[in-house]
């Protein structure tokens, strides 16, 4: 399990992308109706299902705060210790205003090594989980808002019974750096069709 692979914090690298469980490939469908409870009313209790797709876990030893957040944390520690805090200077304030916040991306690649999706990921210190919905990005010539159910347009499903890879990358001031990975994501068809159809590649 994931917890068994964790080491003491002082021995952990800067970032660790953990191996993932095989993901089940299927099409979600509503059971009670178009909305969560359908027409059953609020007396019906429902709970969230586990995230659909491949759940990708990673650990950040220190996190990647913005310059403003790092300065404010240092100032808070000084105030808690009973010390005063000085104005950092206009140069520092202007640099913080112009800074582009560090960003983490989980990069999904297919068997040929081509990038098929990039997932936004939290940059805070600690353990995080991000779910990939097993879909390509949505490409539309016109921006389409979410529908009345709050669902945004999505891309096509990826091919089942195939291996994909995930990498964890950090982007700071436009420069990307690989932190961890790649790890393999196996996508398995959940059920076999009753009738034999065409090959999935067709």
Each predicted region: which residue ranges?
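C-terminal low-complexity, glycine/proline- and small-hydrophobic-enriched intrinsically disordered tails
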Residues: 1-202
């Amino acid at each position: 399990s994931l917890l068994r692979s964790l080491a003491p914090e002082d021995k952990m690298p800067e970032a660790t992308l953990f191996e993932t469980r095989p993901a089940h490939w299927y099409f979600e469908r509503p059971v009670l109706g178009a909305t969560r409870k359908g027409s059953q009313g609020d007396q019906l209790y429902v709970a969230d299902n586990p995230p659909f797709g491949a759940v990708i876990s990673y650990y950040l030893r220190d996190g990647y705060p913005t310059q403003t957040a790092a300065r404010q944390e240092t100032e808070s520690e000084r105030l808690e210790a009973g010390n005063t805090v000085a104005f950092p200077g206009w140069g520092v304030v202007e640099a913080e205003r112009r800074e582009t916040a560090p960003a983490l991306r989980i990069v999904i690649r297919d068997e040929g090594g081509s990038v098929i999706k990039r997932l936004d990921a939290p940059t805070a210190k600690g353990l995080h989980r991000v779910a990939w919905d097993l879909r390509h990005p949505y490409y539309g010539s016109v921006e389409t808002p979410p529908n009345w159910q709050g669902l945004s347009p999505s891309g096509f499903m990826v091919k089942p019974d195939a291996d994909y890879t995930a990498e964890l990358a950090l982007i700071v001031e436009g420069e990307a750096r690989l932190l961890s990975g790649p790890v393999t994501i196996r996508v398995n068809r959940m059920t076999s069709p009753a009738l034999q159809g065409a090959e999935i590649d067709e």
